[in-house]
């Protein structure tokens, strides 16, 4: 059978919160089969556990924020994206602040952390959510859709009218049956515009943002000294975000995701719309590994890629 996965040993790192600018200690621990991914605010007088779920996402203006009983864990999408890319089903995530550290603005640091801990299979079948019919949400000219597809592929179109973005490509599609998440998506960094960063700082946000953890653009060009990691890094990062946003549903999706100018909020609305229609999806497991979609086979999601 295609089995669930967790990590082999505890691992921790320290980083900076993107919005608070404060030091954050992140600890990842193995979790038993069937646990799912559970975030815990260990800095509160009484620790609050927040299991990932589409319904647990509250604020989505600047990031995906898990909320429960007044406790928040912000900016979970890059870590969730890494977990999806490596096929991690069960994990305890302990954090001593209200946001996950931004690291270098991509998912690469989290991939490294998870791989350093070691990834092991558990004696329980991996459960998938298989999309059975199209589900779509719109907001003005923004769109996010899930369609039936025996695998996992994504297509994303952005529309940032900026010289640096225009020349890199505004649309990107990827099918994980024949493409490595670690190589092709994980290293794509978040990006923002200098005038937006200043506005956020005036609101007491983005205090941890810098050229070390984001691609920053002025009106004409990229301010970072280094080159882009991918020719089309901007749209690839939107795919990275979408993978993380979708993974908060609690299981890997078997289906195709199509988006135009979508963001954290619309991605979460899409999950809620899917779950609200019981005829739109089903839970499936695979007793025989070879019957599973190629995107989820061990060779497509190796513990070390």
UniProtKB/Swiss-Prot annotation:
Give the source's domain of life in one word.
Answer: Bacteria
Instruction: Report the SUPFAM superfamilies cross-referenced here.
Output: Ribosomal protein S5 domain 2-like
For the keyword Lipid metabolism, the answer is: yes
Q: Which GO terms describe its cellular component?
A: membrane
Catalytic center residues: 264 (proton donor)
Keyword Zinc set for record: yes
- What cofactor does this protein call for? Zn(2+)
| Amino acids binding Zn(2+) | 78, 237, 241
Q: Copy the pathway line from the protein's UniProt record.
A: Glycolipid biosynthesis; lipid IV(A) biosynthesis; lipid IV(A) from (3R)-3-hydroxytetradecanoyl-[acyl-carrier-protein] and UDP-N-acetyl-alpha-D-glucosamine: step 2/6
Q: What class of enzyme is it?
A: hydrolase
Keywords for this entry? Hydrolase, Lipid A biosynthesis, Lipid biosynthesis, Lipid metabolism, Metal-binding, Zinc
Annotated GO molecular function terms are: metal ion binding; UDP-3-O-acyl-N-acetylglucosamine deacetylase activity
Q: Which GO terms describe its biological process?
A: lipid A biosynthetic process
A Pfam family the protein falls into: LpxC
User: Could you tell me what reaction this enzyme catalyses?
Assistant: a UDP-3-O-[(3R)-3-hydroxyacyl]-N-acetyl-alpha-D-glucosamine + H2O = a UDP-3-O-[(3R)-3-hydroxyacyl]-alpha-D-glucosamine + acetate
Q: Which InterPro entries match?
A: Ribosomal_Su5_D2-typ_SF, UDP-acyl_GlcNac_deAcase, UDP-acyl_GlcNac_deAcase_C, UDP-acyl_N-AcGlcN_deAcase_N
EC number per UniProt = 3.5.1.108
What does the sequence similarity comment in the record state about its family?
Answer: Belongs to the LpxC family.
Q: Which PANTHER family match?
A: UDP-3-O-ACYL-N-ACETYLGLUCOSAMINE DEACETYLASE 1, MITOCHONDRIAL-RELATED
State what this protein does: Catalyzes the hydrolysis of UDP-3-O-myristoyl-N-acetylglucosamine to form UDP-3-O-myristoylglucosamine and acetate, the committed step in lipid A biosynthesis.
Protein name in the entry: UDP-3-O-acyl-N-acetylglucosamine deacetylase
| Originating organism | Cupriavidus taiwanensis (strain DSM 17343 / BCRC 17206 / CCUG 44338 / CIP 107171 / LMG 19424 / R1) (Ralstonia taiwanensis (strain LMG 19424))
Q: Which gene encodes it?
A: lpxC
């Amino acid at each position: 059978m295609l089995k669930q996965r967790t990590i082999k040993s505890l691992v921790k790192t320290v980083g900076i919160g993107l919005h608070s600018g404060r030091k954050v200690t992140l600890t990842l621990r193995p979790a038993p089969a069937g646990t799912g991914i559970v975030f815990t605010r260990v800095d509160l007088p009484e620790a609050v556990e927040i299991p990932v779920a589409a319904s647990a996402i509250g604020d989505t203006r600047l990031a995906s924020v898990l909320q429960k009983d007044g406790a928040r864990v912000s900016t979970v999408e890059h870590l969730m994206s890494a977990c999806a890319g490596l096929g991690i089903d069960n994990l305890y995530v302990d954090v001593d602040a209200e946001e996950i550290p931004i690291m270098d603005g991509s998912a690469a640091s989290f991939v490294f952390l998870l791989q350093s801990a070691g990834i092991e299979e558990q004696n329980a079948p991996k459960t998938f959510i298989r999309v059975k019919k199209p589900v779509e949400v719109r907001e003005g000219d923004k769109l996010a859709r899930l369609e039936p597809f025996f695998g996992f592929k994504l297509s994303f179109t952005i529309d940032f009218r900026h010289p640096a973005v225009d020349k890199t490509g505004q649309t990107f599609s990827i099918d994980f049956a024949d493409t490595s998440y670690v190589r092709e998506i994980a290293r794509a960094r978040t990006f923002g515009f200098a005038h937006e960063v200043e506005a956020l700082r005036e609101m007491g946000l983005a205090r941890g943002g810098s050229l070390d953890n984001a691609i920053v653009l002025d009106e004409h060009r990229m301010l970072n000294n280094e080159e882009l990691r991918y020719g089309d890094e901007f749209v690839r990062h939107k795919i990275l975000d979408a993978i993380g946003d979708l993974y908060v549903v609690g299981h890997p999706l078997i289906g195709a995701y199509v988006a135009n100018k979508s963001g954290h909020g619309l991605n979460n609305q899409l999950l809620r719309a899917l779950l609200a229609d019981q005829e739109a999806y089903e839970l499936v497991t695979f007793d025989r590994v070879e019957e599973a979609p190629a995107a989820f086979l061990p060779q497509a999601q190796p513990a070390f890629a």
